[in-house]
């Protein structure tokens, strides 16, 4: 069975001024995902007890030098911020979504369907060749470009948050108070709705909870009938002693 489809779905082939094809991310949307990836990256690097030795070779006898926690070190801040914008290239454009939610990790529902048709032997004809279906869209490429500028411009703000204000929400601190101060902040109120194929940043909380539940469940299952009988006999034994 053959199906002929002519679908203009990819922003990569559009002219920069063609609003019907390309809807570049706003400053609000860029900051939202910069903050989201910063949170995720800081969370990923918070699960270590590694100590950093502040002494250098020619200062080995310096008794004042001491080890500091990696989680409080400049090294952690540099490692997180250095490759931050590259993480945005993991996002794809989901044109079936609206607002800032059109940016999400994972393949869009539309392209999942098209790939499924191709694998079933259906011929799908679009305005771009099949080999370019998974290329970075113009919108995502622009988001990465804006991120590079934003990270450089607000480097001091991010460092200030890291050193003195980690109790404050990073999206609120970076975007609402600084980057978007006096500007449109409506996208910050748009909540990310996970759908099939999406792989949003994970904090590990849910995973740890499930592992704990599984451990308790396994403990109950392994107790067996013998353990239940022993527990039932305990009150009787105590009564006989009295």
From Swiss-Prot:
Q: Where is this region: Disordered?
A: 191-242
GO cellular component terms attached to this protein's record: endoplasmic reticulum
In this chain the Saposin B-type domain maps to 26-235
- Disulphide bridges: 28-187, 31-175, 85-147
Signal peptide bounds:
1-19
Q: Among its keywords, does the record have rRNA-binding?
A: no
Keywords, ordered alphabetically: Chaperone, Disulfide bond, Endoplasmic reticulum, Immunity, Innate immunity, Signal
Give the GO terms filed under biological process for this record: innate immune response
Q: Which InterPro entries match?
A: DUF3456
Highest rank taxon of the organism: Eukaryota
Where does the record place Basic and acidic residues bias? 210-242
Q: What does this protein do?
A: Toll-like receptor (TLR)-specific co-chaperone for HSP90B1. Required for proper TLR folding and hence controls TLR exit from the endoplasmic reticulum. Consequently, required for immune responses.
Q: Which family does it belong to?
A: Belongs to the canopy family.
Q: What is this protein called?
A: Protein canopy homolog 3
């Amino acid at each position: 069975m053959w199906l002929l489809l002519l679908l203009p779905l990819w922003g990569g082939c559009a002219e920069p001024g063609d609003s019907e094809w390309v809807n570049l991310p706003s400053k609000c949307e860029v900051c939202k995902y910069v903050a989201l990836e910063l949170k995720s990256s800081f969370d990923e690097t918070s699960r270590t007890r590694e100590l950093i030795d502040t002494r250098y070779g020619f200062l080995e006898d310096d008794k004042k030098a001491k080890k500091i926690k990696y989680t409080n070190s400049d090294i952690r801040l540099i490692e997180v911020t250095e490759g931050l914008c590259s993480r945005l290239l993991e996002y794809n454009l989901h044109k079936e979504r609206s607002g800032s939610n059109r940016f999400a990790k994972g393949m869009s529902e539309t392209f999942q369907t098209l790939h499924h048709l191709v694998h079933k032997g259906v011929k799908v004809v679009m305005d771009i060749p099949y080999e370019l279906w998974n290329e970075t869209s113009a919108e995502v490429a622009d988001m990465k470009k804006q991120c590079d500028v934003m990270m450089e411009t607000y480097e001091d703000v991010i460092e200030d948050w890291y050193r003195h204000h980690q109790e404050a929400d990073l999206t609120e601190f970076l975007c609402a108070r600084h980057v978007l101060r006096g500007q449109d902040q409506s996208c910050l109120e748009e909540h990310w709705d996970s759908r099939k194929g999406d792989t949003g940043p994970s904090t590990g909380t849910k995973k740890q909870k499930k592992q704990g539940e599984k451990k308790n469940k396994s403990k109950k299952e392994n107790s067996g009938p013998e353990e239940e009988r022993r527990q039932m006999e305990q009150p009787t034994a105590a009564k006989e002693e009295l």
